[in-house]
Amino acid sequence: MGSPDSSSGSAQKPPRHQHQHQPPPPRRQGSAPELPPGFRFHPTDEELVVHYLKKKAAKAPLPVTIIAEVDLYKFDPWELPEKATFGEHEWYFFSPRDRKYPNGARPNRAATSGYWKATGTDKPILASATGCGREKVGVKKALVFYRGKPPRGLKTNWIMHEYRLTGASAGSTTTSRPPPVTGGSRAPASLRLDDWVLCRIYKKTSKAAAAVGDEQRSMECEDSVEDAVTAYPPYATAGMAGAGAHGSNYVQLLHHHDSHEDNFQLDGLLTEHDVGLSAGAASLGHLAAAARATKQFLAPSSSTPFNWLEASTGGSILPQARNFPGFNRSRNVGSMSLSSTADDMAGAVDVSDGGNAVNAMYLPVQDGTYHQHVILGAPLAPEAIAGAATSGFQHHVQISGVNWNP
């Protein structure tokens, strides 16, 4: 019973030679070649003419079946990528060329919905030097596709590079003359001009123009930012830099209340230029000059208290006084009894010899209602002192014990 089973089993097994040496399935005509990842088909002009077009015209085997055979002038350029064998951004084709007129040599450039127009001059294709000189083997022509009918077509971004053979190599593919007349009658003229030309098709993108536009807009934004920065006066940052570099108590006194709602700034006495103070010998010199000008201005009334309101020509009323931390406000502001002598004014500030810091000390007030006013800022012209005397102070503090004499 075992013999029939064994015989039947052996009969069902195929011969061993049927499993070996099976040929691979034939590749479909026009299918893309199997290239390793990273490889691109991007030959030079010489390689296209010598290794592909010349062999195609001579009916010799090509290195690889990668260029499709398509009559380009029967399609629009945006239909060609689907008919290409290989390519991502540029596509290669073998295409015939026909005559525009039966008795002429001009090629027909008309397509389905437009036409190809030549641009520039023909570029000769030279083979590599094998002996003396280089041999001209082909010509390259650039064309642009236009929608519509000539000469008022709409230019597109589709570009064609057409390669054709020249010289002896073009004898088998080009028919430059019309067919001869035989038997007293003209035979039907053939419109075929070239059996094969090699064409490269690609679409020109506007990435370069977009990159230039983005760069220009970026530069315009940078210029706008620079203009906005330069619009601010440089003395604002100079004053802050001077305060950090020298550690001057005089500058710290100005910036002590920057975070508060009411900044310590005397309206009418301090200008924007005076806020940006720079510590150093130059600032001390301006402060000494301001002290001398103040003393000379108050010299006629040095023996008697000087009334700021009587010197005012406009009779302006002092604005409402505001409280600041660290400063004492007089109780007699409501009655407008601001008075001080020149000697008291001269003893309000002490400038250190050879130093770069101005120390303002808060000391007890002398003699009742006399108030010492420290004029902050550098430099202060005599006109600014006179304007301050006639317009009044918005903030007044009691500071004494500082020598105004240079």
Curated annotation (Swiss-Prot):
<dbReference type="Pfam" id="PF02365">
    <property type="entry name" value="NAM"/>
</dbReference>
<comment type="function">
    <text>Transcription factor of the NAC family associated with the grain protein content (GPC). Sequences of the 11 European varieties of H.vulgare tested belongs to the same haplotype while the sequence found in H.spontaneum, an ancestor of the cultivated H.vulgare which has a higher GPC, belongs to an other haplotype.</text>
</comment>
<dbReference type="GO" id="GO:0006355">
    <property type="term" value="P:regulation of DNA-templated transcription"/>
</dbReference>
<dbReference type="GO" id="GO:0003677">
    <property type="term" value="F:DNA binding"/>
</dbReference>
<keyword id="KW-0805">Transcription regulation</keyword>
<feature type="domain" description="NAC">
    <location>
        <begin position="35"/>
        <end position="204"/>
    </location>
</feature>
<protein>
    <recommendedName>
        <fullName>NAC transcription factor NAM-B1</fullName>
    </recommendedName>
</protein>
<dbReference type="InterPro" id="IPR003441">
    <property type="entry name" value="NAC-dom"/>
</dbReference>
<feature type="compositionally biased region" description="Polar residues">
    <location>
        <begin position="1"/>
        <end position="11"/>
    </location>
</feature>
<keyword id="KW-0804">Transcription</keyword>
<dbReference type="GO" id="GO:0005634">
    <property type="term" value="C:nucleus"/>
</dbReference>
<feature type="region of interest" description="Disordered">
    <location>
        <begin position="1"/>
        <end position="40"/>
    </location>
</feature>
<dbReference type="InterPro" id="IPR036093">
    <property type="entry name" value="NAC_dom_sf"/>
</dbReference>
<feature type="DNA-binding region">
    <location>
        <begin position="137"/>
        <end position="210"/>
    </location>
</feature>
<keyword id="KW-0539">Nucleus</keyword>
<dbReference type="GO" id="GO:0048731">
    <property type="term" value="P:system development"/>
</dbReference>
<keyword id="KW-0238">DNA-binding</keyword>
